[in-house]
Curated annotation (Swiss-Prot):
Organism: Mycolicibacterium goodii (Mycobacterium goodii)
GO MF terms, alphabetically ordered: ATP binding; sequence-specific DNA binding
A Pfam family this chain is assigned to: GAF
Functional summary from the UniProt entry: Acts as a transcriptional activator of the mimABCD operon encoding the propane 2-monooxygenase complex.
GO biological process: regulation of DNA-templated transcription
Residues engaged in binding ATP: 348-355, 395-404
Key words, A-Z: Activator, ATP-binding, DNA-binding, Nucleotide-binding, Transcription, Transcription regulation
Keyword Nucleotide-binding: yes
Sigma-54 factor interaction domain mapped to chain residues: 320-513
Protein name in UniProt: Propane 2-monooxygenase operon transcriptional activator MimR
Amino acid sequence: MVRPADSSVDAQRAREQFLSAGALQPDAVAPSVLNSWQRSRELQVHPDRVDLPYLRDPDTDTPLMHAAAPVLRRIAEDLSDQAVSVVLTSADGLVLDRIAADTEFERILDDVRLARGYSYAEEFAGTNGIGTALETGQPAFIRGSEHYVGTLGGLACAGSPIREPVTRRILGVVDLTCWARQADPLLFVLAKSAGSQIEDRLRTMNNETETALLDAYLKQSRRYPGGVLAIGGDVVLMNRYLRQALDAADQTVLLDHAAELTRSSFTSTTVAQLPSGASVKISAAERIMVGVRGDSVVLHVSVHVAESIPVRGSQHIPRLAGRSSSFRRSAHQVERCYRDREWVVIEGEKGSGRTHLGYSVARFVTPEKTIPVLRIGDFETPESFVAAFDSETDDADFAVIVADVDELPDEVLHPLAAVMQTRAGRGWIAATTSAERDSQLVDMLMLPFFIHTVTVPALRHRIEDLHELVPMLLNELSRGEARMDAEAMRQLAKLPWPGNIAQLRHVLTETLRRQRSGVIGADKLPSECRSVTRRKLTRLEAMERDAIVRSLLENDGNKAEAAEALGMSRATIYRKIKDFGIA
């Protein structure tokens, strides 16, 4: 059944009235259409021309694409004698795929940018079957002049959201577009059916992946005598060895590190320090690939239980904040190495306080000694660095820290190793390094001299230590004149701290520029503290995030007013708030 001509005329009149008067009589158009027109006007979409940005090249290797491909092909074949296009988009309206048999109709779609890489979100294209379905979360059938943009008035589009079967999160939209004069309610029915078919395929693929993950887990459990861990989506499998060897706190930290390794396509092994003091080596044993690119992995976990070290709770090492069991154990391991004059590698993420830990422990045990810290960046030439090391280790009872040995240039390593060879068996050297170093020369020339390795936990893995770290750093930076209130401390505890203590010091320094004394509230924290995204932002993204946070603060949290002040649409600011994790 083709839509009657008079209803098309009514929609055209209603659109013209809305654009001129900004209001309509009740029932002039469907409420969903009117609401979308109002959103389009607020988003400042141009009503007379298509002005769409090319966002990015579509990613064709996703579960959504793999699930949708056969459904789209089948529908396109069934409609091959019709001027109908089958379109798949992402959750932000980006056109991922488009199939149309009619070449003339394809040219029309190219003219209105209904093509791969362009976005048909409402913020760009106004009212349409794709953007309106995404905005409302419901199927949408937009015909002729119901489109907000006049250029699209010759088309009709039926869009149906596609949801992830478990979480029900919207993954994208399947859309059928045809000439407005040929619009048929059956097109809407077909679009909704296509959406359901794609969701069914996603559900089947999830089940296949979970089955494959279970099979791989059981296979690795039979072959590997140690810990076996499987992670995929919402599924976590842990063998009895790990459940018995690790308590709940250790298991939580293990899963955190394992999840990070699972998401990485470059790293296959990592080492982690657990709250109990045990360390684990986590290695990817098998990645599950069942027709899609996924993050399902079976891991081997080797557990190394630390020797029992008495933790003397009454002893406090000055300028060394942190009462978490993992950090205290690291400190006491370094202390034991220093007292026994055994060389030690202190490894951990950059900014985690590796050098500070070694220096503070050495000064605590021997306050009368000077503990030199050698950094290659403090010297004009590699030769002067090696000469300084030679001089500082010349006496029989020397103590020295070499910072960031994994960053030493190759021309330093050979002469430095030669000097170390002559110092073996006396004095004390601590060398700091990243746990994920990739320098084979460092492993070959440097590490054999060191008896022990102590891992300093990342700040995000000992977040409870903020209660000591923040007051200590504030006291140092403000001379005791400032402190954080409870709300500010709660906000700091939410952050992932990829830059560790170095980032915390920077944050507190920036905060004190806003308020130098007294009780500091969360509103005085810098912009990066309002963002809880785990990925590292580019410099441009960080500037954009800061501008949004400032505008939100200046407009008392009103997103619409903040967007207007920044000259961006409301939909854009909502999307960026979500992307940047602005709290």
